[in-house]
């Protein structure tokens, strides 16, 4: 939902294939974090506690504990499952969009910004685990402004509210 809001707000033309891939990439971008949590639940919990108490990022703790961070794990899983390369790149590099070649950069930037916005709104795994940081070059390259951020945030909140209502209806 956030990736779609970012795409709609971009002042630069977002190619149709990027717009379509953004939804799937937005859903799958933290695939590696889910896998690491499933494979190493105790270590993952300890990392979250350490981040709350001492600061730092999930990626830094993942690298320290396992020598690999969740983006890379997710990218490797996506490759193994033959998920399209553009989505693999978004999963792998959503925290480092500058590492991606030009052919996938727009999608990765969209997911990077959507991830940043969702985490800072508290829609991430744990908003206290993530720094309030994003790559300003990604923001600028998509032609986004401060005013756009307010619109994106409103769209994400509205979509989240709809999701909550739908979930309540489905659970009843």
Please provide the spans of the model-predicted regions:
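Metal-dependent nucleotide-binding catalytic modules
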Residues: 1-172
């Amino acid at each position: 939902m956030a990736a779609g809001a970012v795409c709609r707000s971009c002042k630069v033309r977002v190619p149709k294939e990027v717009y379509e891939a953004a939804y799937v990439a937005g859903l799958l971008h933290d695939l590696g974090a889910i896998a690491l949590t499933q494979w190493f639940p105790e270590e993952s919990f300890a990392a979250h506690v350490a981040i709350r108490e001492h600061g730092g990022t999930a990626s830094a703790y993942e690298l320290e504990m396992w020598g690999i961070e969740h983006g890379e794990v997710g990218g490797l899983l996506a490759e193994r499952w033959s998920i399209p390369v553009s989505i693999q790149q978004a999963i792998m590099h959503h925290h480092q969009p500058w590492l991606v070649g030009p052919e996938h950069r727009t999608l990765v930037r969209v997911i990077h910004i959507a991830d940043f916005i969702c985490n800072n709104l508290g829609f991430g795994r744990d908003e206290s685990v993530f720094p309030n940081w994003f790559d300003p070059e990604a923001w600028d390259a998509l032609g986004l402004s401060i005013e756009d951020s307010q619109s994106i945030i409103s769209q994400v909140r509205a979509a989240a509210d709809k999701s909550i209502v739908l979930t309540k209806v489905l659970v009843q």
